């Protein structure tokens, strides 16, 4: 127990040499600050000329024109845990976007899986004696970029691809050691204040459709 109460925060700051002043705080306007630091991405008549080149990235990089880049302001994150059909699900989503949204520009990442034990070594040994050996939990994360005007269409395509999964082919390991079908897949939607520019090479435009894993055979995840 303390013999006396600890000093207050202002008192401690004064002892450390910080100066304190009374008065209103100057809190900047968020919208004003955002407009001052935002990057102009609307390609209007006042933007850079179409024939003018501008450097991208560090010095020494190849100069690109603005026509080589596409602005995005909406991001979807597809997330799931212990989804055994991770690669097949993301391939299905990518194939659906290429086939059903060919007239709009969309970009997406490949399957990103992260695994972790989630139990200590001592607890893992104890559970092993009870004939239940929990394996690592694998997390699926896939990101899809589009423009806000195309967000409803992309959202519907994502929902359709997720609902089209076959229950007999997707299972997860629950806490009781049994396998259960249809792992829940979550879709999160984010909207940016400023648009993000991506090169056209990173979009799904005119990309070949991978039909290697579209059959009923087993896919390695």
Swiss-Prot record:
The protein's location, in the record's own words, is:
Host nucleus
One GO CC term, this protein = host cell nucleus
The record describes its post-translational modification as: Phosphorylated.
- Decide whether keyword Transferase is in the record: no
What are the alphabetically sorted keywords of the record? Host nucleus, Phosphoprotein
Q: Which InterPro entries match?
A: Herpes_UL3
Please classify the protein's predominant subcellular localization into one broad category: host cell
Q: Does the keyword Phosphoprotein apply?
A: yes
Protein family (similarity comment): Belongs to the alphaherpesvirinae HHV-1 UL3 family.
**Name of the protein in its database record:** Nuclear phosphoprotein UL3 homolog
| Native source species | Varicella-zoster virus (strain Oka vaccine) (HHV-3)
